[in-house]
Amino acid sequence: MRTLTIYHLGLIDYRTAWDVQRRIARARSAGQVGDTLLLLEHPPTITLGSRASTEHLLVPAEHLSAEGVTVVQSDRGGGATYHAPGQIVAYPIFKLLQHGRDIGRYLRGLEESVIRVLRDDGLIGERVPGLTGVWVRNGAAKICAIGIKVSAGGVTTHGLALNVNIDLRGFDLIVPCGVHGRGVTSMSAELGEVVAMSSVAERLIGHLCAVFDLEPAVVVTAGQWTAHLPAAERDHLAQR
């Protein structure tokens, strides 16, 4: 069974996390590191995927900036989504072919991992035909957004954003994932109580490992993670 290195990065801005993903993905493609999972939160940020445009912003960009919300055009798939503290963001950096999976099966695996996390807390997570992500209440509200990129070498970046205790008012700023007529929710909103983020994160790790046949090995905390990068990538980040 292959092992999984897990990086707990804490609160980190989107562009920095994106740069870290790219560097680990290059190392993964070169065989310098194994499969890796980044777990983190972002400050208030709207990301626009390959199917999104500024038309999916419901307020002017200058207003967003004044409110401290960053807007980033990302290279992931999907539409617009909102990130903020209280949301667990997971970025798996996997060599897709080593898991014997095509992109569709990989996406279904991410969804299945989240569905199992929700089931642990008595919530019924669902798929909606033709859409990516995890929903509740018969598809009425999205609880987890998923958007990925797969490199020419078959290495995945980006991933999923599971709403745990996030302030849902931030989603009023966008058309979430470009889908009209459906709501957005969180685990705490559905359960009526604050949910322990650490518990959700640990269970998400366990279910991802079960679905993708991985063994969690090295757990790296925010203050230590650069030491685990290949030297060339570590030196570059030190110069930032």
Curated annotation (Swiss-Prot):
Substrate binds at R76, G77, G78, G79, A80, T81, Y82, H83, A145, I146, G147, G159, L160, A161. GO terms for cellular component: cytoplasm. The active site is at C177 (acyl-thioester intermediate). The record marks K142 as: Lowers pKa of active site Cys. Pfam families: LplA-B_cat. Catalyzes the transfer of endogenously produced octanoic acid from octanoyl-acyl-carrier-protein onto the lipoyl domains of lipoate-dependent enzymes. Lipoyl-ACP can also act as a substrate although octanoyl-ACP is likely to be the physiological substrate. This is Octanoyltransferase. It comes from Roseiflexus sp. (strain RS-1). The lineage of its organism: Bacteria, Bacillati, Chloroflexota, Chloroflexia, Chloroflexales.
